[in-house]
């Protein structure tokens, strides 16, 4: 018998679910009861078992009897109302979430092992994070292992501490929780006085009970950042401050130290969004390097120097670099012997150390790497013998790799970015042909969809996603005129998800359209995107250029020494100011001015 063609009906699953839902509403074909708080809900065992691994396990270990009795599934810790909402979700894929019910739904989804529902709850919680609730959401997320939500809530707390410290939630913290919060290195306060004043407000909220915790809580204060004249002024005006300073011996009232002694004890709060470069090759010898450096364009605008960080465990070139959840991840690439690698490493900016990661399923170089909610997606590339279309995903919390659907085509040296929790693959080439096509991958449906193509076909470009926008910078193509094979730098392009089309950016001040320019990375920080590469301006080479999204204009960064490296991997990474300060001291990047008497 001849083989036929496989055909499918896209509405088949939806129709089936609607029919099953109507059976449930009419209590038809039900063969079990859920028992919650003494109330029974008729259900179909096979549907619940398919949806919930927890119920499936209960059925496997306690199978129905053949005596004709109604099978009962007892559940504790879930209310009838919430369970009905979850049953509606199981049969429709939709659920109503609000701030009053979200905690109960997460608890139920956690018990029933409904991972898809838990993911929807996480996305809802992400949109709820605010000054009034970020500490509570942070604690809740930690308890239920909602890792990405916990990271976002912590990041919000660090960034908006002054707003958070004025809320009722902050004033109701336990002494232990308060101490944990004010111990965070990255609190964005500018001056330690704001942390001190937050603690004063907390004590004053219930003075008689909290006085006994005064000394313990104040031990978490970074007293080196408190000005003695400010403290003396507060003591004159506030009896509570007088009592606290008298009780806590660690709070300084003497004149601050000067010179080297001051630097040795100084510990600045806050963080800096840094441009990090990793690996690549030495410009002169062309040997792969393990070097890692960072530059903080907003930390010290007048001193934009490169700070040396801990090097990789091995030299890498043509590797993938990405920051996620406060860490930096590096995978694949090639070593000094041009051997294609599958290994990976993770950088912890708090410890300034690297640790090894489980290797990728396939060794590859010149591949794409993007991140969505703590999941790292590795796309395409080459393995030294052939071009790859495979995709795999690394969960940074479970430390496991899973295979994903293949790319629909080879995109040699294409560019990739994430935007609105979807992955975009752009440009690239294969067998001498360059592409302008763009495809979008939705991890939920695991489907690739073609979208509006780029205005210019290109390879070797870099891309990034910011909010609802995609940016593609640089890349090269052959000149489309009688001059034939000469390569030129492509114009940068911009895509907005609402308008669904690509628009040229003004690249006049990025680089000249010659083949001598190469881009290595595009790093979004604040309201700007920093493009890193060998950027030929016509008169000299720049290593970093700033693109201001609000005005669509390019700007020089402060004067930088010419880089001795090329083809580096690039990313943005949030690093604590106190760590950067120590590194700058160790590397002699600070100089003390001693005023003559």
Curated annotation (Swiss-Prot):
Which part of the chain is the BTB domain?
30-99
Effect of mutating residue 82 to F: In GAN1; no effect on binding to TBCB
Annotated ranges, domain BACK: 134-236
InterPro entries reported for this sequence: BACK (IPR011705), BTB-kelch_protein (IPR017096), BTB/POZ_dom (IPR000210), Kelch-typ_b-propeller (IPR015915), Kelch_1 (IPR006652), KLHL16_BACK (IPR030579), KLHL16_BTB_POZ (IPR047070), SKP1/BTB/POZ_sf (IPR011333)
Q: Where are the Kelch repeats?
A: 274-326, 327-374, 376-421, 422-468, 470-522, 528-574
**Subcellular compartments:** Cytoplasm; Cytoplasm, Cytoskeleton
Amino-acid biosynthesis recorded as keyword: no
Task: Report the transmembrane regions from the record.
Answer: none
Question: What tissues contain this protein?
Answer: Expressed in brain, heart and muscle.
Q: In which pathway does it act?
A: Protein modification; protein ubiquitination
Name the PANTHER family for this protein: KELCH-LIKE PROTEIN 31 (PTHR45632:SF17), LD33804P (PTHR45632)
Could you describe the subunit structure of this protein?
Answer: Interacts with TBCB. Interacts with CUL3. Part of a complex that contains CUL3, RBX1 and GAN. Interacts (via BTB domain) with UBA1. Interacts (via Kelch domains) with MAP1B (via C-terminus) and MAP1S (via C-terminus).
Identification of the protein by name: Gigaxonin
Species name for this entry? Homo sapiens
